[in-house]
Amino acid sequence: MTQISRFIGEVVPVAQRVTGDGGESAAPDGGGGFADYALVSLHCLRIYLDTSYRMTVDLLKEMPQITGEIGLDAADLPAPSTLCKAFDRISMSVCRVLLRQSAQLHDLSEHAAIDATFYDRSPASRHYCQRISYRVQKLKVTKLVDTASQAVLDVHCSTNREGSDADLAEQIARRNAGDLRSLAADKGYDKKSL
């Protein structure tokens, strides 16, 4: 069994449980869409392989065993654009569960650190943003990271700069309070209630 096969063998049951549609057929039947667990599994595999959407689909056409474990045939694979659009529709709650599942693969301490980072939008997508009147230029990502394993425990994404980092840190800390003994942060997170 290859590493990819072991990986997909772990991902598919988790994706089925998280999306709640494990009983559905992965491939679209009678004009329907792909099952959510199949699309989530394909995205996890794309990230694991560190490839583009197009390359992931091309590789999977040559891997019938892997596509079979997802419940698809090579002929049933979605187009790269379908896979890309499906990624935008995955809810944050599904992403958080997948993040938590991946963090459990590490030996976690009870100590974490929190910090925020801003990401600029890619210049390649500027034309698309102007065409649809999408004005987001920066994305603020706040991450909670285990200090021993460097595993990301939680993430919060925001497109606006309103509110303080301390308010957001309090929300993330409450969500993970049962798992933490200490939380480290820089002085931008200085708040009495935190």
Task: Indicate where each model-derived feature is located.
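Alpha-helix initiation and N-capping motif
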Residues: M1, S5, V12, Y53, ...
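Basic, short loop/linker segments at the boundary and entry of helix-turn-helix/winged-helix-like folds
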Residues: M1-Y48
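DNA-recognition alpha helix
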Residues: R54-L72
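Major-groove recognition helix of helix-turn-helix-like DNA-binding domains
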Residues: E69-I90
